[in-house]
Structures are given as C-alpha cells and as structure tokens.
C-alpha cells in the first residue's frame, strides 16, 4: 500500500505545481496520481495541433446534458487526460484576469485572495520574456512570451480593431485590460510549455516524489471526519489505497474534483442516495456554481494566404520540426481584445479571440479556403450550472449542465459582440482582404436572427470553474479561504473548481496561481511570495 505525507489527485495545471513545490522539502514524501498517461504525443508539443487532441485518449471528452437555453443541445467539454492535464491540450493563452476579479473573490468570503495578494504568485511562477517589472516576473518555471511566428494578417486584425474604436494597449496582463493587443502565450522556443513541462518534469528526479499514471481514483478514505487516503485502480489490478499522513489534495479539475467528492459521499445526501452512494458528510455546494465562458466565431474568407489553412502540410511540419517556427507555432487565436459593449459596465463583458483560421465546432469542421475568425467570448457569464453523478460507478462520466444563456444580458452581450466583430472586419487594413462572411453569414441581420445563430452555434471555451466554491461565509461554499473542505480534516481542493466567480479571461494562469498560493498555505509560508517580490 503506497503512502506519503501528501497524496495529490490529478497531474494537471494545479497538481503539477503542488507536486513540485511540496517536494522541494526533501523530508516530505509526495505521491501524485494521474488518471491519464504521459504527454508524449506530438499533438501536445505542436501549438497549432491542440484541436487534434479532442475526442482522443488524451481527452476526458465530456459533454453537458441538453442545455435548456441553447436549443436543448449537448455542449462539448474537453478536459486534458495526461500529465499536464488541460495545460497540455489548451490554446496556451496566458491571461490572468482583472484585478477586480480577485477583489470580488475576497469580498465574497475569501480573505487573502485579493489582487494585491495574488499578484506576487503570478510573478513568482513566471519567466516572462518582457522582463521583470511591477507586473511581471522572471526566473520562474512558467515560460511566457509572444507568438513566435505570428500570421501577417494578425497585424491587420489588430489594426482593424483599433480602427473600430478599440484602443491598443501594451499588456493586458498589466495595469489596463480594456483594449487590443497580441496574446501572450505559454511557449518555449515554439513549443507548448505546459504545467508538466514547467513544474512536474524538473521535479520527477527527486526521490521523495512518486508519480503514478493510469490511476483512476474511486473515492476518498474517511475515518470519521478525517480523510486519510485515496482509493484508486490502475489498469486491471484491484483497488489500491494510497495513505496520506498529512493531507489529500484534490486537483482533478472543476469536473473531476466534485465527482470524487460525491463518489466519496460528500455532498447533498438526498442526491447521493438517488445514485446509490452512502452519504458520509453533508456539503450541498459540491458540484454547484459551475461556470464557463461561452463563445462563437464570426468567420470571414480572406484573400491573404498567410493563414492556418493547410498548416498540416509536410513543409510546415518540417519548418516546425527543424526550426520551431512557422504556422504550427500559432495558438490559432493570436490577437486578444477586451471590450465593453455598452455604457455603465464596471469592466469588459466581451473578450475577442482573433486568428487566421476557420474555427467552428471546436476546430472539427473544416473549410477549403483562407479565413480569419473574430470570436466574441462572454467574459462574466451570469449563468450558473452544476455537476452531479450519473451513477456510483467512478468510470461513468458525471452529468453536468451550464445553463448558458439563461440570463438575457448574457445573450445581449454576445449579440453586441457579433456586431462589433463585423465592424472590425469592415475596417482597413482588413476590409479589402475580406472576400465574404461565412459565419453567421450575410442573411443574418437583425437581433432575433443573431440570437438564433448564437443559440445554434454556441460553444464553451474550455474554462469550467467554480464547482467547489471557496468562501468562509457563503452558504454553498465547499472550501474555506485556505482551501480546506468545510467540516473535514486532512482534505483540500486545489484547482479551478475553487474559484467563487470565473475570472475575466482564460483560466489556466489563474489555476497555476491558485496552486502556487496553496502550496504556501499548506507549508505555512503565506506571504512568502510577497516577501520574495519585495526582495
């Protein structure tokens, strides 16, 4: 029976950070359990190939229940299933979110998670190509830089955005977020730089860190109100128990972590009994508060041939393999913009992802021609969903619903975002290169037609959060401000599921920050990152 001081469940964006930081102490034994396998696929390494991982063994391949406000369709929810987790399959976009996001966390019962508290942890993790500054760090494990070989038409997208009235800003991860600028990316020398690359692989040579892949967790071991270990299966072997002398740390993500809690009898007792799980600890908030960013693309065929069309040709593969440059270094979305679509908003309600590609149906639909996509993303959705068990079998995927577009204001923002996308495409230097609008198409004109198109084509942009809400005071909270599960000892949740409210932007960088700060909380070193930054 394996044992350790800390047993970490999930080698994703948070689990890799925890494994590295906790094993820095040679006297501490750390066991990391990962359901997936190694991250050796070429589709992990090549930035532009990330959609090739969808619906493969590298993907948990979830989908929602029929969504009541999106024509009853099931929405695809990919999640990484290998070392690095979703940081090994995402679009590598480094976006922290806005200071007001974290100050809101603090106001909602999470002291110590305001912007001034979390900024030092962002800086600690970074090795930013821009150099050290008030907002950025160097020397950290996470490589952050600019696009290595941006598409020529990406500059046109940026300049057209400015012509449409969106100011150009130097750094959306700096003092001002509203505006347009190139995306910053998790890459090193033209290849993906995941949490596994940054944190786990450098630590795997340590004798006090053990990593077990192919380990599907069945549930937690409880002794009264204390969690003492984890039950898991590896391959065809029988159930094994990993004992934790100090703590179990759940880092299985916003879908996996609540599923494990529920399978362990931690949640709403009535709902647990319905699927044959014996209740062990009442915590009704488990699985509630699910949030994600809905999006869709305005897509235009263009005359410029410097796009990602036919990027998988041998010559482009050779350029990436030999020089780590060219089309395949693209993250598909190369230009970012945060905008407020109407007066009176406290912050941007739409984030644009813009790139030189036809991106529809999560990249699974193709088009024979050169295209650009201008995709409005709903930054602060008001909809709240949930995750719950399908059955008591750990191998059964959980059920989930996001309730996307339940709030009319969310739909209003996306309609405005689609109109602004068209306005950007109508500005030079882009307008003269646009051949025609493909999506939603020129026949879609008035608000009702745009709303219908949005409901038909809406996607989720791979940012599920919130299902183990952090708060010292909220009634539906699952963990406190130190990420300890309410009412239990020896158990914390450390991943995107603890976010009380989704951040205004991509969620991978915030998840790594959460784990950096959690490592200090666990080690009793809170404030260490602030002291390091001041040194």
Where are these regions (language model features)?
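N-terminal redox-cofactor-binding region of secreted/periplasmic oxidoreductases
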Residues: 1-535
């Amino acid at each position: 029976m394996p044992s350790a001081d800390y047993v970490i469940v999930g080698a994703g964006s948070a689990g890799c950070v925890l494994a590295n930081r906790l094993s820095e102490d040679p006297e501490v034994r750390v066991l990391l359990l990962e359901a997936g396998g190694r991250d050796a696929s070429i589709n992990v390494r090549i930035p532009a190939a990330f959609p090739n991982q969808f619906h493969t063994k590298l993907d948990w391949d979830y989908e929602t229940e029929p969504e009541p406000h999106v024509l009853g369709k099931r929405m695809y929810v990919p999640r990484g299933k290998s070392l690095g987790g979703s940081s090994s399959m995402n679009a590598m976009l480094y976006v922290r979110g806005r200071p007001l996001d974290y100050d809101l966390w603090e106001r909602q019962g999470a002291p110590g998670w305001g912007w001034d508290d979390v900024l030092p942890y962002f800086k600690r993790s970074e090795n930013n190509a821009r150099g050290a500054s008030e907002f950025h760090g160097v020397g950290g494990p996470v490589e952050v830089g600019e696009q290595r070989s941006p598409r020529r038409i990406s500059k046109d997208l940026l300049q057209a955005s400015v012509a449409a009235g969106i100011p150009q800003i130097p750094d959306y991860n700096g003092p001002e977020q509203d505006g347009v600028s190139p995306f910053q990316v998790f890459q090193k020398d033209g290849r993906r730089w995941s949490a596994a690359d940054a944190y786990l692989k450098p630590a795997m040579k340590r004798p006090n860190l053990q990593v077990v892949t192919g380990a599907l967790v069945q549930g937690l071991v409880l002794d009264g109100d204390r969690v003492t270990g984890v039950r898991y299966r590896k391959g065809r072997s029988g159930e094994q128990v990993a004992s934790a002398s100090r703590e179990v740390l759940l880092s299985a993500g916003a879908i996996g972590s609540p599923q494990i809690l529920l399978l362990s009898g931690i949640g709403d007792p009535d709902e647990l009994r319905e699927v044959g799980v014996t209740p062990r600890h009442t915590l009704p908030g488990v699985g509630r508060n699910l949030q994600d960013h809905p999006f869709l693309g305005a897509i235009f065929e263009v005359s410029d041939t410097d796009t990602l069309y036919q990027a998988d040709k041998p010559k482009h593969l050779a350029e990436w393999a030999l020089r780590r440059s060219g089309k395949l270094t693209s993250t598909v979305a190369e230009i970012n913009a945060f905008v407020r679509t109407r007066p009176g908003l406290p912050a941007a309600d739409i984030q644009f992802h813009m790139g030189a590609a036809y991106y529809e149906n999560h990249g699974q639909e193709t088009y024979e021609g050169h295209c650009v996509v201008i995709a409005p993303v709903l930054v602060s959705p008001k909809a709240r969903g949930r995750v719950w068990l399908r059955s008591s079998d750990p191998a059964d995927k959980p059920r989930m619903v996001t309730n996307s577009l339940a709030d009319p204001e969310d739909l209003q923002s996306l309609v405005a975002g689609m109109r602004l996308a068209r306005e950007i495409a109508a500005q030079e230097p882009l307008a003269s290169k646009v051949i025609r609008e493909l999506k939603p198409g020129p026949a879609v004109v008035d608000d009702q037609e745009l709303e219908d198109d949005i409901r038909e084509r809406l996607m989720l942009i791979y940012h599920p959060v919130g299902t183990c809400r952090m708060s010292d005071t909220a009634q539906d909270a699952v963990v406190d401000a130190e990420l300890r599960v309410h009412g239990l000892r020896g158990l914390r949740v450390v991943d995107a599921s603890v976010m009380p409210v989704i951040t205004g932007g991509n969620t991978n960088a915030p998840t790594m920050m959460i784990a950096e700060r959690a490592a200090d909380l666990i080690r009793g070193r809170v404030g260490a990152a602030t002291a390091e930054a001041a040194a």
